[in-house]
C-alpha cells in the first residue's frame, strides 16, 4: 500500500511582482511616470532612470516585444489596485436574505442579540427576515407577535426600511426588512431642544430730579 501523502503545512508561495531587479529582460520599452515614451532601452538604463526618480520600474506587459515597463510608485499603485478590487467586490455583492428567529416571549437580552444580528446583516447589504415562531397554543398571541416585530422595525429604523409588514405565515409571523438607501431624518419632538421660559425682571423706574429734591428736604 503506497504511503499516504503528508499534509503540507507550509504557506502557499505567493507570486512576486515583476519590478526592479526581478525584471530579467535585456531590452525594455519604457513609459515614464508622466506617460512620456522613453522608447526601447536596455534594462540597466531603465533601472537607473527609475532610481534617479526614486520610483520603481514595473513590468506591465510581458507578452509585448519587447516587454513594456512603466516607471511608477509601486506601493501607491498596489494600494489603488487593492482599493479598486474591494470596491468592485462590494458592488458585485449578491443580496441574500438572512433570517432572525425568536419567540414572542423573548427576554430583553436575547432581543438585543437579535437586534445585533440584524444590524450586521443589514450593514452587509442583506435583507433580513424577522420570524416569530409559535408553538402549540401560542398561535393565539399573534397580536403580541406583531407588536414585537413592529418594535423591532422601530429599533432598526436607522438601518432598515420595512419591505413587507408583519403577516402570519403558517405557524409563524414574519416581516421583511431591507437596508435603508437614504439616511433617516428624524422630525419628532423628542429630538427638538425644548425652549425654557425665561422670567423677565423689570428694573424699577429711575427717580426724577424733583423727587430727589423732595427726598433731601424730608431728610
From Swiss-Prot:
GO CC terms, sorted: cytosol; membrane
InterPro entries per UniProt: T_IF-3_C_sf, T_IF-3_N_sf, Translation_initiation_fac3_CS, Translation_initiation_fac_3, Translation_initiation_fac_3_C, Translation_initiation_fac_3_N
Subcellular location, record wording: Cytoplasm
Gene3D superfamilies: Translation initiation factor 3 (IF-3), C-terminal domain (3.30.110.10), Translation initiation factor 3 (IF-3), N-terminal domain (3.10.20.80)
Entry superkingdom: Bacteria
Disulphide linkage map: none
GO molecular function annotations of the record: ribosome binding; translation initiation factor activity
Gene Ontology BP terms: ribosome disassembly
Protein's UniProt keywords contain Cytoplasm: yes
Pfam families in UniProt: IF3_C, IF3_N
UniProt keyword list: Cytoplasm, Initiation factor, Protein biosynthesis
Subunit structure: Monomer.
Function recorded in the entry: IF-3 binds to the 30S ribosomal subunit and shifts the equilibrium between 70S ribosomes and their 50S and 30S subunits in favor of the free subunits, thus enhancing the availability of 30S subunits on which protein synthesis initiation begins.
Protein family according to the UniProt entry: Belongs to the IF-3 family.
PANTHER family reported for this sequence: TRANSLATION INITIATION FACTOR IF-3 (PTHR10938), TRANSLATION INITIATION FACTOR IF-3, MITOCHONDRIAL (PTHR10938:SF0)
NCBIfam families xref list: infC
Record protein name field: Translation initiation factor IF-3
